[in-house]
Amino acid sequence: MEELGSPALDFSLPNTNPGVGGPSVSLNTLNEHPALLVAFICNHCPYVIHIRDSFVSFVLDYREKGLAVVAICANDVRTHPDDSPEKMAEEASKFGYPFPYLYDESQAVAKAYRAACTPDFFLYNR
């Protein structure tokens, strides 16, 4: 977990939900927003499944207030095949994710953020 007041760490990752944000998303593409929520989620996690609909509603409500949201999945597809980029794209489409859903294949971004489990949320102001 990052220290309170830390700046958001830079990233550039492929987007499995390209209708929202394009084929890849970086921190720089989100800079025009006054606040940023980085959410580490995945398809198979029962906690993520439980909050999924509420999270989508939350994002729809707060993006109108200037909150940018990006979700990142950093699971290894060998151990979690339901979290593959193809399955992520299906999930984003099926549940109408209104945010980029990024794939962190190397887990470098998750490690840099010290994301420990899913869901794990990091909120930043500018």
Where do the language-model regions lie?
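Chalcogenol-based redox active-site neighborhoods
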Residues: M1-R126
